[in-house]
């Protein structure tokens, strides 16, 4: 268990969006305890847990002073986040959550329900929307490759923000 200053901090990524942000974070710095929840193991420098292992992960994380979550909402990873977040009530939780594009109607509705369960008076963190990327698009119908580049830049910026914040805690 690594310490940042006096605090024991872990970073937990959930699902595709969370994993992409974590991948960028690990490219910037690797001196933190990284945990990844996904359908399959995709990160080399993170402890992996499957979606069905939330109780075991919560038990392992209960020894930390602060847990930083990165996750996309609107899918299975958002549901896992809601469960895990609730299991860690006694630990400080800081969330960097990503909501779907406005045109992903079903995922957007599901993300709102997930946010409703997490955004209590003790919520700390940021809720970021992928819709902000569309402002950078010049075409009415953006190409998939351009959108993927914008999402990667978004992931890098969020990762940099989290790593910078963690370094200030030192």
Curated annotation (Swiss-Prot):
<protein>
    <recommendedName>
        <fullName>Uncharacterized protein AF_1120</fullName>
    </recommendedName>
</protein>
<dbReference type="InterPro" id="IPR036525">
    <property type="entry name" value="Tubulin/FtsZ_GTPase_sf"/>
</dbReference>
């Amino acid at each position: 268990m690594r310490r940042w200053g006096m605090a024991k901090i872990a970073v937990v990524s959930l699902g595709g969006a969370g994993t992409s942000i974590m991948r960028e974070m690990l490219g910037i710095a690797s001196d933190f305890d990284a945990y990844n929840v996904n359908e399959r193991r995709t990160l080399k420098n993170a402890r992996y847990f499957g979606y069905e292992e939330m109780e075991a992960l919560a038990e392992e994380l209960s020894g930390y002073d602060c847990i930083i979550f990165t996750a996309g909402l609107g899918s299975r990873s958002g549901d896992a986040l809601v469960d895990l977040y609730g299991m860690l009530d006694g630990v400080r939780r800081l969330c960097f959550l990503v909501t779907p594009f406005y045109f992903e109607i079903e995922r957007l509705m599901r993300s709102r329900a997930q946010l409703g369960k997490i955004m209590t008076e003790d919520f700390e963190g940021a809720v970021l929307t992928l819709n902000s990327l569309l402002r950078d698009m010049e075409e009415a119908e953006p190409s998939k490759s351009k959108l993927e580049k914008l999402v990667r830049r978004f992931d890098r910026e969020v990762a940099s923000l989290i790593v910078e914040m963690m370094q200030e805690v030192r």
